[in-house]
Amino acid sequence: YEITTRLVGSEMCIRDRIALVKGYDHNFVIDDYEAGKVQKIAEVVDEKALRSMEVYTDLPGVQLYTGNNMVPELGKGDALYPCRGGICLETQFFPNCARQEGFIKPVVTPEKPFTSTTIYKFVN
C-alpha cells in the first residue's frame, strides 16, 4: 500500500489485508531513504485538537499499527480508550530483513554497535 494523505480509519477493514488484522499493522518503505540521513517520514494531524506529530528517522521503514487487538480500557478522567483508539508509528528495518534478498541488513557487532535516531515532534 502507498500511504498518502488520508484519514486514518477511512480505509480500515475495507481492503483484504487490512480486514485480516482488523486495522493497520503494516511496514511501509521510506521511498527516498538515504542511509544515515534523518528525514521527515510521516505526519499525523489531529484536526479537531489543532495539533500534529511529525516523525523523523534515519531508518528505511516504519510500522503503522492501530492497536487492533487492544482491550477497551478506562483512562484518565474516565475516558474510554477503545480498540483502535490510537496510532503507533515504529521506525525500523524491514521485517525479516536478514533473510530477504535485496533488503538492508543491520549488522551489529561489538565493534559496530547499533545506533539510530527517531524524533517524534509535537506541533500545535
Predicted regions and their residues:
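Single conserved hydrophobic/aromatic residue that forms the stacking wall/gate
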Residues: 1-14
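Acidic/His-leaning functional-site neighborhoods
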Residues: 19, 23, 31-33, 37-94
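C-terminal or internal capping secondary-structure element at the end of a domain, subdomain, or sheet
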Residues: 87, 92-94, 98, 104-124
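Generic alpha-helix signal with a bias toward terminal, lower-confidence helices
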Residues: 9, 56, 65-67, 74-76, ...
